[in-house]
Regions:
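Catalytic alpha/large subunits of respiratory electron-transfer oxidoreductases
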Residues: 2-6, 10, 16-345
Length: 345
């Protein structure tokens, strides 16, 4: 079975003939501690239950939430827990003479404080990783504010964001709202890989409502038919000007949805794509209280919350000022909070 949701057949099996191989013979259900929580493998926010035995996570199961994941979870969500037990860093290390050596938390804190004190606030920067929880992010920001530095960023890439309004960086139509849409336009997005639960909703909308689906860019097999209308930013310009056939289709639709993927938001081109689409939707009254067709599909669980907390450095008309300073070597000390994807070359 080729599907990102294939393991859900385990939950569907009425007699227990289909079982989870990694969980087989691991524990008895009544011995497990059950904790209800939220999935962090993508930005969908699927409701899950984590079953633990002692310190080990034995299995992850879906919880019903009709507004988000219904009763499904992705295979990635279900099986990612096998990496939680082994090869974990459970003690701090300090590099001495090119070698990492174990140390105590007290010594690590002293080393950190001494390093930070040796630089001015403008030379100190912090980057938050994609799996950092909001309480940790808030504490991280408070710490930087206490030393007089505002050089904070939650983006490990040059993704364009407009934090002036919250609607600029969230999925406004809601996941459940996909089922009510009569037209969906994907812009630089592959929902099957980026958010498989959301992709299942799009498939459901197509099957039940015959929703028309279009894409700018070729995302490959999405498990439902769609029409590719172009592959570059010139299509966005034509749509905004009303000179592309999809423009009229969007205008005639009752509840259109435009999903902008992160790959369409890189750099200054991302600024143009987002702002042009938003202006087009606003002009045609598709950004309303009862229906908002503007949707940004992020891939990181903590990205929206970090933006809400102000973890970004944006100067006037410069969305990427933090990265410009980083590339120009203006930061002498960089504090990475779970940020592993920064390329310092």
């Amino acid at each position: 079975m080729e599907s990102e949701l294939s393991a859900n057949v385990i939950d569907l099996c009425p007699v227990g003939a289909l079982t989870s191989k990694p969980y087989a013979f691991e524990a008895r259900p009544w011995d497990l501690k059950k904790t209800e929580t939220i999935d962090v493998m993508d930005a969908v926010g699927s409701n899950i239950r984590v079953d633990t035995y002692g310190w080990e996570v034995k299995r992850i199961l879906p919880r019903i939430n009709e507004d988000i994941n219904e009763e499904w979870i992705s295979d990635k969500t279900r099986y990612a827990c096998d990496g939680l037990l082994k090869q974990r860093i459970d003690t701090p290390y300090i590099r001495e003479n090119g070698q990492l050596k174990k140390t105590t938390w007290e010594n690590a804190k002293k080393e950190l404080i001494n390093k930070i004190k040796s630089f001015s606030p403008n030379e100190v920067a912090g980057i938050v990783g994609d799996l950092s929880d909001l309480e940790m992010i808030y504490s991280f920001k408070s710490f930087f504010n206490s030393i007089g530095s505002n050089n904070l960023e939650c983006r490990q890439d040059r993704i364009y964001i407009n934090p002036e309004e919250r609607i600029n960086y969230i999925f406004n139509s809601s996941i459940k709202g996909i089922e009510n849409s009569d037209l969906i336009l994907l812009v630089g997005s592959n929902p099957r890989l980026e958010a498989s639960i959301l992709n299942a909703r799009i498939r459901k909308a197509y099957q039940n409502n015959n929703t028309k689906i279009y894409s700018i860019g070729d995302p490959g097999d999405l498990t439902y038919p769609y029409e590719i209308i172009g592959s570059n930013t010139s299509i966005i310009k034509l749509i905004a000007a009303g000179s592309h056939e999809i423009s009229e289709k969007i205008k005639k639709s009752k509840k259109p949805i435009i999903i902008i993927g992160e790959s369409a938001l890189y750099g200054e081109a991302g600024r143009y794509i987002f702002e042009t689409i938003k202006k087009f939707l606003f002009t045609n009254n598709f950004i309303r209280n009862d229906w908002n067709a503007l949707n940004v599909l992020t891939q990181q669980a903590s990205r929206v919350g970090a933006i809400d907390l102000g973890l970004y450095s944006i100067a006037k008309n410069k969305n990427f000022s933090f990265f410009d300073k980083l590339e120009n070597g203006l930061f002498k000390f960089i504090y990475l909070l779970g940020a592993d994807d920064i390329n310092f070359k």
